[in-house]
UniProtKB/Swiss-Prot annotation:
Residue stretches of biased makeup (Polar residues): 157-180
Biological process, per Gene Ontology: DNA-templated transcription termination; nervous system development; spliceosomal snRNP assembly
Region (Disordered): 1-27, 52-83, 148-216
Cross-referenced Pfam families: SMN_G2-BD, SMN_Tudor, SMN_YG-box
Subunit structure of this chain's protein: Homooligomer; may form higher order homooligomers in the dimer to octamer range. Part of the core SMN complex that contains SMN1, GEMIN2/SIP1, DDX20/GEMIN3, GEMIN4, GEMIN5, GEMIN6, GEMIN7, GEMIN8 and STRAP/UNRIP. Part of the SMN-Sm complex that contains SMN1, GEMIN2/SIP1, DDX20/GEMIN3, GEMIN4, GEMIN5, GEMIN6, GEMIN7, GEMIN8, STRAP/UNRIP and the Sm proteins SNRPB, SNRPD1, SNRPD2, SNRPD3, SNRPE, SNRPF and SNRPG. Component of an import snRNP complex composed of KPNB1, RNUT1, SMN1 and ZNF259.
Protein name per UniProt: Survival motor neuron protein
Biased composition annotated in UniProt, kind: Basic residues: 63-77
Sites bearing Phosphothreonine, chain numbering: 20, 64
GO annotation, cellular component aspect: axon; Cajal body; cytoplasm; cytoplasmic ribonucleoprotein granule; cytosol; Gemini of Cajal bodies; neuron projection; nucleoplasm
Length: 287
C-alpha cells in the first residue's frame, strides 16, 4: 500500500503485451512464397529452352505451307491476257459507269496492252472513260441488266399501286354515297315547281301553258345542311334563315349567303311566272 507503488494487475485483465508473438514491425503480407514460385517457373522455362523443347514448337508456324498468291496472280494474268486477246478496238461491249455503277453499252476506242486498260465511249452519250479490260462485259450483260432494272421498277410500281389501293380501301368508304345522302334533303325540301298547265291558280283557263322561267338548279351539296325543311306545296313565305351563332367562320357565312341568294332567285322566278300566267290568262279571256 505504501511507497507510492501501484497494485499489481491480475493476469486475466491483460489484453495486449508488447514483444510477445507478432510485433508491430512484422510484415503480414509476406510474398516470399509467390516470389519463389515465379523464380521456379522462370527457371523451368529457361531449362526447357536449353533442351530445345520449345524451339520445335516455335518453329512449327514457320513450317506451315505458304499461301499461293503467285498462282492466283498467274491465273489473273492469264485471264487478263485472254481478255486482251478477246477484245479489240471497235468492239461493242458493256461497261460499268463509275458515276452511278450502272451498266451501259459502249464501244472500245483504244486499248493499252501494257497497262491492260482501255478507253470506252458510251453509246448514245459520248462520254469517254478508262476501264480495265478484265472489267468489260459482253453486250448481252447490258440487256440483261436493263431487263432486271425494268422488272425491279415494275415491282416497285406495282407495290406503290397496291399500297395506294390499300390506303383508299382503308379510308372512309362510300364517299359518293355519303355525298348523295347529304344532297338528298334538297329533293325532299325543295318547293314544288310551278304548274306547267292550268291548276286553278289565278284566273287563267285550264290548259294554258305556263311560260315562266324554270326553277334554278339547287346549290352544291355541301350547302344542303343550311336548307331547313318545310312541307311541300306552293311556297307562301320563304323559310327563315338559319340562326347563325357568333362563332361561325367565313365558310359558314358564305354558305348562308348562297342559300339566301338561291331562295331569293327561286321565289322571284316563281312570282314572275305566276304573274305571266295571270297576264296570258286575261289576254285569252278577252279574246
Amino acid at each position: 500500500m505504501g511507497g507510492g507503488g501501484g497494485l499489481p494487475e491480475p493476469e486475466d485483465s491483460v489484453l495486449f503485451r508488447r514483444g510477445t508473438g507478432q510485433s508491430d514491425d512484422s510484415d503480414i503480407w509476406d510474398d516470399t512464397a509467390l516470389i519463389k514460385a515465379y523464380d521456379k517457373a522462370v527457371a523451368s522455362f529457361k531449362h526447357a529452352l536449353k533442351n530445345g523443347d520449345i524451339s520445335e514448337a516455335s518453329d512449327k508456324p514457320k513450317s506451315t505451307p505458304k499461301r499461293k498468291p503467285a498462282k492466283k496472280n498467274k491465273s489473273q494474268k492469264k485471264n487478263a491476257t485472254t481478255a486482251l486477246k478477246q477484245w479489240k478496238v471497235g468492239d461493242k461491249c458493256s461497261a460499268v459507269w463509275s458515276e452511278d455503277g450502272c451498266i451501259y453499252p459502249a464501244t472500245i476506242a483504244s486499248i493499252d496492252f501494257k497497262r491492260e486498260t482501255c478507253v470506252v465511249v458510251y453509246t448514245g452519250y459520248g462520254n469517254r472513260e478508262e476501264q480495265n479490260v478484265s472489267d468489260l462485259l459482253s453486250p448481252a450483260c447490258e440487256v440483261a441488266n436493263n431487263v432486271e432494272q425494268d422488272t425491279q421498277e415494275n415491282e416497285n410500281e406495282s407495290q406503290i399501286s397496291t399500297d395506294e389501293s390499300e390506303n383508299s380501301s382503308r379510308s372512309p368508304g362510300n364517299k359518293p354515297n355519303n355525298i348523295k345522302s347529304k344532297a338528298a334533303p334538297w329533293n325532299s325540301f325543295l318547293p314544288p315547281p310551278p304548274p306547267m298547265s292550268g291548276s286553278g291558280l289565278g284566273p287563267g283557263k285550264p290548259g294554258v301553258k305556263f311560260s315562266g322561267p324554270p326553277p334554278p338548279p339547287p346549290p352544291p351539296h355541301f350547302l344542303s345542311c343550311w336548307l331547313p325543311p318545310f312541307p311541300s306545296g306552293p311556297p307562301i313565305i320563304p323559310p327563315p334563315p338559319p340562326i347563325c351563332p357568333d362563332s361561325l367562320d367565313d365558310a359558314d357565312a358564305l354558305g348562308s349567303m348562297l342559300i339566301s341568294w338561291y331562295m331569293s332567285g327561286y321565289h322571284t322566278g316563281y312570282y314572275m311566272g305566276f304573274k305571266q300566267n295571270q297576264k296570258e290568262g286575261r289576254c285569252s279571256h278577252f279574246n
